[in-house]
Structures are given as structure tokens and as C-alpha cells.
């Protein structure tokens, strides 16, 4: 019996010792830290970016995300056409997308206000090129044939606006011929060496690099500004968000804007490095071409009231040219994030 009591006493002593040790450890441990604000708000984001200038601003973000250096986790897709972006946003496969500004307005109308524009990322990227011919003013293009991409989209309406602002009737004083893709412009002069070409970046840079006779006649951004006189700004590209995603993840959207702004700034300051990424991710075929084109790609980051003022004026011009260009109606004030 004494032996049993001794064993019981020993067990009780051990239990008490362990309890005291546990209590002591708990008292000395640091309280569990709450998640930081960034950790609480970060999210996985399905980001769609179109090829060309609209997508250049996302290249450094893409690389940073792949390296695990971003707060949000980005799954980036680069579709081949606007229709794929529209479908992805409609189905909820895309959360945020970099698109043309008139497409953003069209989506706003098609979805009954279901998307919001977060920032403008691209200004003017269009130039009128000739195969050696000279022209001092746009009005001197009367009688010329002008080849252009983007029928029914930004390029056509910008071209019409600039021609009309210089006293030319786009349907009578010049011959407009549209091509399906900007890359098709590379072969135009083989069949029509006297033609003038409306080329976006990086196609314009590629043409100038490959054809020693090619020259830039007019920068369309400069010509737009001469006509608009400050009433509107040529804003061709933007990033939009599905409102369902925005409402569910407001903090993640704010983080995106911070990380995206940094990506654009790096694209402007580190052109060579960004050009390498453009080739790596398949945005532009060759880094050498991208490096020459990026400084002319109108990269910017405009938000809030400044974005609303410039973009609403631009969309007004598009609407006046053809209401269908922006989806039949101008977007409401709720279209503009933070304005």
C-alpha cells in the first residue's frame, strides 16, 4: 500500500510541475500578432492584359508576382482579342483588365454599370507615317489613301477627329482603308507606296526600323491637342475592375493600384529591363523593338479627379463621332474610381 501511495504522490507532483511549467511558458510568450492591414486585404487577382502598349505597364508587376514579391497574388492572362476580355469579365474569369478606354465605356453600358475604371495607363500611341512623302500640315493629306487598323475602335475615331479638325472630310477628301491588325501595315507599301499609314506602337517603331524611307509625318497626340485645346486628353488605355470583385475586395484593389503604379514607373525608368520582360512574356516579339518603342508608348498612371476630367472629355469626343464607339451612352459618374 505504501508503494502505491508513493507512486500516486509522484504522479501528482509531476502533474503539478508540468502545469506550472505550462502556465509559466504561457505567461512569458508574446501575444499572437494580428495580421497586418496588407495581409488582411491582399487577394488573388485574375488580371487580363491586352498585347501592345496597354499591356506594357503590367510587365514589371508580372515579373514581381512570379518572384513572390507582391502583396496580391496575380494570375495574368494575355488574350489575343478584345472579345476574349469581354467574355472573361462577363463570366467572372477576369477581375481586373487592361483595355482600350472606349471598350471600357462599352463594357460599362453592356453590364449596366458593372465595371469601374481604376486608372488610365496609356495616352496616345498613334502616328501617321509616309513612305518618304512630305506634308507640313494634316490638311495636305487631301487626296491621299490612309491605311489604318481599328475600324470602329479608338484608332478610327481619333483619325476622323484629327482629319475633321484640319478641315478634311474623312469620307470625301481622303480614302480610308482599314486592316484587321496593326501588323498588316508592314506590307502596305509593297502594294501602295504612296499611301499614308496610321500606325500604333510598337508597329510604328517596327516600320521605321525596317524601312529607311519611312518617316513620321504627324504625332496624333500632338494633333489632337492642337484641336482639343485642353478640353480633352487623348487617353487610349486604362485598367478596369468588375464591381463585384471591387465590392468584395476593396483593400486588394487599393494594393493593386499601388503595385501597378510602381510597375508603370519602373517601365518608364528601366526601359531596357522592361523591354526584356516584354519579349519574355510574349507581349512584343523582340526586346530590341520594345526598347525603342516603349518611350513612345504613352505610359502613364492617372487616377481620381484628373482621370475623370481627361477621360470623360475624351469619351465625349468619341460619343460625338459615333455613340456606338462607347456603347451608345456616356458612362455615369460611378464609372470613375476615386473621383
Can you name each region flagged by the protein language model?
Residues 1-10:
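Bacterial N-terminal signal peptides that target proteins for export
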Residues 18-22:
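C-terminal motif of bacterial Sec signal peptides marking the signal peptidase cleavage site
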Residues 24-27:
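Bacterial signal peptide processing site
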Residues 30-178, 195, 201, 217-218:
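Short, glycine-/small- and polar/acidic-enriched structural segments
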Residues 60-62, 126-136, 233-251, 300-303:
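A bilobed periplasmic-binding-protein/Venus flytrap-type ligand-binding module shared by bacterial periplasmic
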Residues 102-103, 184-277:
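Pocket-lining segment of extracytoplasmic ligand-binding domains
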Residues 246-321:
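Secondary-structure end/capping motifs
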Residues 312-339:
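Conserved C-terminal helix/tail region of periplasmic/extracytoplasmic solute-binding proteins
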